Curated annotation (Swiss-Prot):
GO terms for biological process: translation. It comes from the Bacteria. InterPro entries: bL21-like, bL21-like_sf, Ribosomal_bL21, Ribosomal_bL21_CS. This protein binds to 23S rRNA in the presence of protein L20. GO terms for cellular component: cytoplasm; ribonucleoprotein complex; ribosome. Part of the 50S ribosomal subunit. Contacts protein L20. Pfam families: Ribosomal_L21p. SUPFAM superfamilies: L21p-like. This is Large ribosomal subunit protein bL21. Keywords: Ribonucleoprotein, Ribosomal protein, RNA-binding, rRNA-binding.
Length: 104
């Protein structure tokens, strides 16, 4: 089984063909094709090729499914005996993509 490890938005993802991955928001329309070129490693037929830092000529082709927002994450800080508290929420914007092809 072939897989690839790529970098997008400061994070690294390990994928195989057909996987659905949540990436940082990319402002692409649904059904649009995306090429991910920052491929760190590719394994095909048991042979692993690692890049320094990226694998030459390797890319991952993906299709945009949709965009969305994640669940709200709440951070709450309270300082005891001081009548001081802070509540802040955060929702991640993401683009859901399907990995269609790994080219190495």
């Amino acid at each position: 089984m072939s897989y690839a490890i790529f970098k997008h938005g400061g994070k690294q993802y390990k994928v195989v063909e057909g996987d659905i991955v949540l990436l940082d928001k990319m402002d692409k329309e649904p059904k649009a094709l995306v090429e991910l070129v920052e491929v760190l490693a590719v394994s095909k037929e048991g042979k692993l090729s690692c890049g320094k830092p990226f694998v030459n000529g390797a890319k991952i082709e993906a299709e945009v499914i949709n965009e969305g927002r994640g669940k709200k994450v709440i951070t709450f800080k309270k300082r005891r005996r001081k009548d001081s508290k802070t509540k802040r929420g955060f929702r991640r914007d993401f683009t859901r993509v399907r990995i269609t092809k790994i080219v190495a």
